[in-house]
Amino acid sequence: MQTPPELKYAPSHEWLAPDGTVGISDFAQDQLGDVVYVELPEVGRVVTAGETVAVVESVKTASDIYAPASGTIVAVNEQLSGSPELVNQSPYTDGWLFRLDVTEESGELMDAEAYAAANG
């Protein structure tokens, strides 16, 4: 399982990059199986940490995606509408979900080492 050290991780398996980019972890995409659809939030939406903001559907199940921080959605990954498999192939780069202008991080975020220990 990959856990890039520069990211912070939520117990619900979302990651948050220093620039506000959000996605799901390698562990999460592996548990979901092949992703077939991603429902993304609207740009401009104000969200609170812990709020459901997106849905990732796989051949196995649908999973809610929660905001790992409070802030405003400033971008979404439009590539996912035609290529949802990017979430599986590249969860930390091409498979990102949305970007936040962060106002406050969740107090539950973990560093890579703690996240790996909790899910290893």
From Swiss-Prot:
SUPFAM superfamilies: Single hybrid motif (SSF51230). Pfam families: GCV_H. It comes from the Bacteria. InterPro entries: 2-oxoA_DH_lipoyl-BS, Biotin_lipoyl, GCV_H, GCV_H/Fam206, GCV_H_sub, Single_hybrid_motif. Its cofactor is (R)-lipoate. The modification N6-lipoyllysine is found at K60. GO terms for biological process: glycine decarboxylation via glycine cleavage system. Binds 1 lipoyl cofactor covalently. Keywords: Lipoyl. Residues 19-101 form the Lipoyl-binding domain. GO terms for cellular component: cytosol; glycine cleavage complex. HAMAP family: GcvH. The glycine cleavage system is composed of four proteins: P, T, L and H. Belongs to the GcvH family. The glycine cleavage system catalyzes the degradation of glycine. The H protein shuttles the methylamine group of glycine from the P protein to the T protein. This is Glycine cleavage system H protein. The gene is gcvH.
